[in-house]
Amino acid sequence: MGTRFVSSVESPVHRNFKDKIIDSGIDGTLILNKSSKPVIRALKSDLTINIDQKGEMDMSAMMNIQNLYFDGDMEAAPALSGQSTGLISEIKPVKKIIEEIIDEFNSVCKKMGNIKF
């Protein structure tokens, strides 16, 4: 859910970050630092591909994350993003996102029959 709201109209992150989420597709993320902690998922970029090839991420890679979030420098730090990245196809207002979540929930409940929530 976090990635969906980061890519909303109201999110304060730079438009470059939002656009990268939209453009990434289902294979647009990498799981980094698999053999250490913290394990993170981030959008593919030259930086994250390099980190993935090394197999381990030095936490100094996160030092410039403000430049990524607010200046739009997509190579400044790993752009944290969840598995839902590939399901996000447009930047929407939060109100619309929540309405769609509720509609989808209600649709699934109807398919489940008499289960009441």
Q: Which role does the model predict for each range below?
A:
Residues 1-117:
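Conserved active-site-proximal phosphate/metal-binding subdomains
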